[in-house]
Amino acid sequence: MNRWNAFLCLNFFLPLPEASVHPLAWNLASALAFVLLGLEFRGRLAEQSLRSLPALPVTPAFSHSTLPLVLIWCVQLWVVVQWAITSLSPYDSLMSLSQGLLYAAVFTLALLLVDSRQRVRQLVWVVVAAAAFQALYGAFMVLTGLEYGFFAEKEHYRGVATGTYVNRNSLAGLMELSLALGIGLLLAEPTRYFGSARQRLRQLIEVMLSKKLILRLLLAIMVIALVLTRSRMGNTAFFASLMVAGALALVLMRNKTTATTVLLGSLLVIDIAIVGTFFGVDKVAERLQQTSSQTESRDEVTRDTFNIFLDNPITGTGAGTFTHTFPALKSSEVTSFGLYNNAHNDYAQFASEFGAPATIALAVVVFWAFWNGIVAMRQRNSRFYQGVGFSVTMAIVAIGIHSTVDFNLQIPANASLFVVILALSAVARWAPHNSTSGRMRRRTGRKASA
């Protein structure tokens, strides 16, 4: 198995063992990512030596990503400092460091390995396949009443879709990110109908027999699973991000076709009106209507988490320490008897654990990626990379909304996929228009020299 296929397998299997929330799972994933990263750099050093190149051969996406690479790796160095000196729970900070190294390695690998349209397609299909499996599994458990997670009977969230995840909101986060990639791929490869009625009919039949129909069906299944999670903010974030990214696409994209507008409109109408009607979007709406300050304590948890940040604005309490620091520092208004493993607000939790400088550094990486997505939609002449830019924009908006009330970025499988999408923003903006993979280019070069 080559490095690229191993990277695809890593992205496929991360969601399976309960979203890799257990230390064994994320430590193994981190070790694999570092092995792949080491092998990738060794291969590029060998290529540099073989071809007598003045510098290490890297992709355009990697060469334009110096700032985010420096920031994301410096944050890991900061966690090392926290673990050694300032953390209120050094063991938890060490575990968080292992997760952070996984994300940094995956981000770097994506910039180095995703160097062609073919590889972008393969990566998107792998992510969609992994999410579709989770969607089918979760929907099957709900509709049959079997209620099993990852080789164990579910203790919580019975009657709603969780897939092999523990938390329904985390599964909703996976659906949001994967749907963004899938919809972007549909936009990246639009169907064009032209010619006589007979030719148009032939083109329609070809579409019905192509991978596009399979992709559209998988996306519909994922929307069904999203609705079946009954996640209020998950569903809200998905549809809001689709509308925001869709509006930006219609305004920014050059040479828009009627098919683009029809596709975006059909996604909203079909998914809400048809899929939602049959699979219970009304129950999600009912949960939204029943939400009040009396039924939710997340607002108080977020407020107390922010107060913890104000007590440690620079150094933070230490990465990964929320579970052990919050019970001792929460106010008396938080009366829940359950243990809060996370703050239910990624912004507040990152700030309280990492401190302001590191949190700002991570925010810069996200805004850098968001800007790349916008620029790709506006300036690229390639419809394919415009579609990738759409995916990045939609995914960031979705997670940005959902993170106000949940903790998707504390879930290793979701956070890893998110950093892959951040890396794809550089691919969308800077990848050559008709790029082929580095492996294919090297083969072509050897044949030419022979």
Q: What positions do the PLM features span?
A:
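Transmembrane signal-anchor hairpin modules in multi-pass inner-membrane enzymes, especially those
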Residues: 1-95, 101-129, 185-216, 243-266, ...
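Membrane helix-loop boundary segments at the extracytoplasmic
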Residues: 12-20, 167, 349-354, 387-420, ...
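Helix-loop-helix junctions and helix-breaking kinks within/between transmembrane helices
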Residues: 18-28, 166-169, 209-246, 281, ...
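Hydrophobic alpha-helical transmembrane segments
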Residues: 76, 80-83, 119-150, 166, ...
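A membrane-periplasm/extracellular boundary helix in multi-pass inner-membrane enzymes
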Residues: 136-146, 189, 193, 220-230, ...
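Membrane-interface segments at transmembrane-helix junctions in multi-pass inner-membrane proteins
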Residues: 148-187, 233, 346-350
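TM-adjacent membrane-interface loops and short helices in multi-pass inner/ER membrane proteins
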Residues: 167, 299-341, 347-350, 354-361
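Hydrophobic transmembrane alpha-helices and their immediate junctions
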Residues: 356-390
